């Protein structure tokens, strides 16, 4: 069986106006040496007022401003692609510029529509993001690859293999329908060394452009792997501009260890709780489709630094507390357990929403109540009426920060829960809730989300990690 690597390069990997592309070219040449290669692109970054911004965010701002009746200009996006175009050789430059102009023209039409209709949503929003971001970048990267003597091609939207449901702005992958649309991509895999495709973007069966949630390019890579894992020896490679370490380097500076292996469960939890490793829904989709596929996270600047994500890691001899992470802006719903069953079923089947954790229940006045930790407080606020409709006596606590300790083998750590809670107390923070489950080796600590409380808690627990004894 031939090898196939699905490599995703995110916005930070592509860099400001494509500054990371020379490194990407080196990685592509290495990856394609013994494998077929599909590249999944995110939108590039640019700089506005001295700050790095994704072109996705730039376009979202333009769309909202246009919908508010303001005059907007696409000049920052146009200038970014003009800079990237300089990496295309003379032989391919005219054709590449034509594609850029055509797609940015289509994105501009979406802004004009938003301005006239007073709204920037659904397919108008999806088209603007596709034509100014991921889809356009995949075509531009194709011309850059060709300019460097790489046999490459890209996938047009007409041949798009990722088919989704009708939830336009937060869509869901449909395997059976997608599996019927992979012939064009499969033919290109056989014909070329490298194929580029935009991440984050899908299409309905009727041809309407859709988008995943933010971070959805990871899902695109996973979905392509799911579609081809029986045809090729398939691996997902998420190329990052840094290594996976035991805490966020922006929060913790000292005693950080490289994390060499993670289970699917550990990677999913880390993603849910704020570590930018992999979109947890990508792991969920791999599991739901019954696929056992290797996923790696590679530091593209130091490719020897790799984190392997597997269903069951081969080596469990390392530190059992692999990662300490946390998330701000969470909310906790307290709801009668009988009503919670209906809510959870509705979230799964109707909303297709899974960014929550079910905490341990409690009993009061003879009634059992469930506690549901939502990892996006803003989502709950937007849908508060819907959430509370399942139980008029339910209550929601906002402004909750959550710290979690991650490691399937944490049962090997002596007194881990008490040590973690003690360190948070030493940092002067009050624990509002704590949930520890032996079955999942999961420890969740809830505190008030104010100032830098979450960062302080992560720092406090991580400082104890190197001193912890384990069996």
Where are the regions a protein language model picked out?
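Residues within well-ordered alpha-helices
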Residues: 27, 141, 221, 282, ...
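Phosphate/diphosphate-binding loops
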Residues: 264-299
């Amino acid at each position: 069986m031939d090898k196939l690597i699905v490599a995703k390069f995110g916005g930070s990997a592509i860099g400001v106006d494509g500054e990371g592309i020379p490194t990407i070219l080196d990685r592509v040449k290495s990856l394609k040496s013994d494998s077929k290669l599909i590249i999944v692109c995110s939108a590039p970054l640019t700089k506005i007022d001295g700050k790095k911004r994704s072109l996705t965010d730039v376009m979202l701002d333009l769309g909202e401003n246009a919908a508010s009746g303001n005059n907007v200009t696409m000049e920052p996006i146009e200038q970014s692609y003009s800079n990237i175009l300089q990496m295309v050789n003379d032989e391919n430059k005219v054709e590449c510029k034509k594609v850029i102009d055509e797609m940015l023209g289509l994105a501009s039409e979406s802004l004009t529509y938003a301005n006239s209709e007073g709204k920037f949503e659904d397919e108008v929003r999806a088209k603007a993001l596709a034509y100014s971001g991921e889809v356009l970048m995949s075509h531009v990267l194709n011309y850059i690859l060709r300019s460097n003597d790489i046999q490459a091609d890209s996938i047009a939207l007409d041949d798009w293999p990722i088919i989704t449901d009708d939830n336009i702005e937060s869509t869901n992958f449909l395997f059976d329908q997608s599996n019927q649309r992979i012939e064009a991509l499969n033919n290109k895999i056989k014909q070329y060394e490298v194929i580029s495709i935009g991440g984050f973007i899908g299409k309905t069966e009727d041809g309407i452009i859709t988008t995943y949630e933010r971070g959805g390019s990871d899902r695109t890579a996973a979905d392509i792997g799911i579609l081809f894992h029986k045809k090729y020896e398939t691996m997902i490679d998420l190329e990052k501009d840094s290594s996976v370490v035991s805490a966020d380097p922006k929060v913790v500076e000292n005693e950080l260890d490289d994390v060499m292996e993670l289970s699917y469960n550990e990677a999913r939890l880390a993603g849910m709780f704020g570590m930018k490793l992999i979109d947890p829904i990508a792991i969920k989709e791999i599991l739901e489709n019954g696929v056992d596929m290797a996923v790696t996270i590679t530091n593209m600047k130091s490719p020897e630094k790799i984190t392997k994500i597997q269903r069951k890691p081969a080596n469990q001899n390392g530190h059992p507390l692999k990662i300490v992470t946390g998330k701000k802006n969470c909310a906790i719903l307290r709801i009668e357990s009988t009503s919670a069953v209906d809510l959870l079923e509705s979230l799964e089947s109707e909303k297709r929403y899974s960014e929550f954790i079910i905490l341990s229940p409690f009993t009061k006045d003879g009634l059992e109540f469930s506690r549901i930790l939502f990892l996006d407080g803003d989502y709950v606020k937007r849908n508060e009426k819907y959430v509370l409709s399942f139980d008029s006596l339910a209550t929601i606590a906002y402004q909750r920060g959550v710290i979690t300790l991650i490691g399937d083998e944490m049962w090997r750590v002596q007194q881990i829960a008490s040590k973690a809670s003690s360190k948070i107390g030493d940092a002067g923070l009050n624990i509002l809730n704590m949930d520890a489950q032996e079955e999942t080796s999961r420890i969740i600590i809830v505190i008030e989300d104010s100032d830098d409380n979450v960062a302080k808690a992560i720092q406090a627990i991580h400082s104890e990690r190197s001193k912890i004894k384990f069996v």
